[in-house]
């Protein structure tokens, strides 16, 4: 029987009333969890965070907030093996890919904990030097950085449910703002468990962390000018968020990370028999296969001198042929499946478009066989 994921809002875990969405194991298509946010009062969830989490965090110095980040990192790391297993179960990740996400999360929290410990022992951060404001030396001024009195709303992508959650939360908590995190529904199982751990360990002040598992519903309609939104995902969805009427009217700050475009460039002076050439091929293959290519830093363009095209194509095809694709729980598997059917459809559509302009040098556009 699949698990029923709960959101964590208003200081308590809540389940949606209807319209359950299913989370699957990408390897088997088995439903591993279901979730919904139907019936959850988004306005109340935000108000609870503003009225409880915000004041509690603002009372703390940067060093004290940094200490919380360190505690969060340690609490999650203590459950590392469990989190890695969930990453494979709901994300289709190999052990190595799961570590990339989970260890990235705890490492980021630890990094900002160390950084925060070097900042002010007060709740404020001085910005620049004291400036003379008039002829009299008695009139001086200085800028200070202070926390906003709202909620940091984080809408995250499906590919990094651990790291994406932690890297956004770390900077918000260090800045003295409560967090409402909404993971992509398809891979929310990992984030949900991380939140459960942090709540059980009582790491954060009440209201400093909220979780939505499922649709955001009318969440954006209840934001104020003191709230902020950080979104990772497609440019189209980012545009919809930026264009939300309430966000425009309230002047809500919105940060969007979307549709990265990355390249690997081989210089014209490169020797095809050199160690550096081999490294180039290995790194390109890694970017294609790590997390099945489902990451923002994946290489989309490989730029090589025309006279090296055949050599690079042959070497890259050989490198990819050695990668075993299959059930990520099995030994020797280097690449797991795509996360869901929509990702498969998107990849196949992309391949079809590319073949109008390019020639395939390895594989085909079918789903393919998986080692089990």
Each predicted region: which residue ranges?
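ALDH superfamily catalytic-core signature
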Residues: 200-202, 228, 236-372
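Short, cationic motifs built from Arg/Lys/His that form the positively charged side of catalytic pockets
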Residues: 62-65, 182, 301
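N-terminal Rossmann-like NAD(P)+-binding subdomain of aldehyde/semialdehyde dehydrogenases
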Residues: 1-137, 322, 339
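Short alpha-helical
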Residues: 40, 78, 82, 93, ...
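A conserved hydrophobic position in a structured secondary element of the catalytic/binding core
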Residues: 24, 233, 304
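Rossmann-like NAD(P) dinucleotide-binding subdomain of oxidoreductase/dehydrogenase enzymes
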Residues: 121-278
């Amino acid at each position: 029987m699949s698990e029923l994921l709960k959101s964590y809002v208003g200081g308590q875990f809540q389940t949606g009333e209807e319209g359950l969405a299913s989370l699957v194991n990408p390897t088997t298509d088995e439903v591993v969890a279901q979730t919904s946010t139907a019936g959850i009062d988004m306005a109340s969830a935000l108000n609870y965070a503003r009225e409880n989490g915000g004041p509690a965090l603002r009372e703390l110095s940067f060093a004290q907030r940094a200490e919380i980040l360190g505690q969060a990192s340690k609490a999650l790391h203590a459950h590392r093996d469990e989190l890695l297993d969930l990453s494979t179960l709901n994300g289709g990740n190999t052990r190595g890919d799961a570590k990339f996400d989970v260890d990235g999360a705890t490492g980021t929290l630890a990094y900002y904990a160390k950084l925060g410990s070097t900042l002010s022992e007060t709740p404020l951060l001085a910005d620049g030097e004291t400036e003379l404001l008039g002829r009299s030396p008695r009139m001086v001024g200085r800028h200070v950085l202070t926390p906003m009195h709202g909620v940091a709303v984080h809408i995250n992508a499906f590919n990094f449910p651990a790291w994406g959650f932690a890297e956004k939360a770390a900077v918000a908590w260090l800045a003295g703002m409560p967090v409402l995190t909404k993971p992509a529904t398809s891979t929310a199982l990992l984030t949900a468990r991380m939140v459960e751990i942090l709540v059980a360990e009582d790491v954060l002040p009440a209201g400093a962390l909220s979780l939505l598992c499922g649709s955001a519903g009318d969440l954006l309609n209840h934001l104020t000018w003191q709230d902020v939104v950080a979104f990772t995902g497609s440019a189209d969805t980012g545009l919809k968020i930026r264009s939300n009427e309430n966000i425009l009217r309230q002047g809500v700050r919105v940060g969007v990370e979307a549709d990265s475009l990355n390249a690997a460039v081989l210089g014209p002076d490169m020797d095809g028999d050199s160690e550096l050439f081999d490294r180039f091929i290995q790194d390109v293959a890694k970017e294609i296969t790590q997390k099945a290519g489902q990451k923002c830093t994946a290489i989309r363009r490989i730029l090589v001198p025309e006279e090296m095209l055949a050599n690079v194509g042959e070497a890259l095809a050989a490198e990819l042929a050695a990668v075993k694709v299959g059930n990520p729980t099995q030994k020797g598997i280097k690449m797991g499946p795509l996360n869901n059917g929509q990702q498969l459809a998107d990849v196949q559509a992309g391949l079809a478009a590319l073949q109008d302009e390019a020639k395939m040098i390895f594989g085909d556009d079918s789903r393919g066989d998986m080692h089990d």
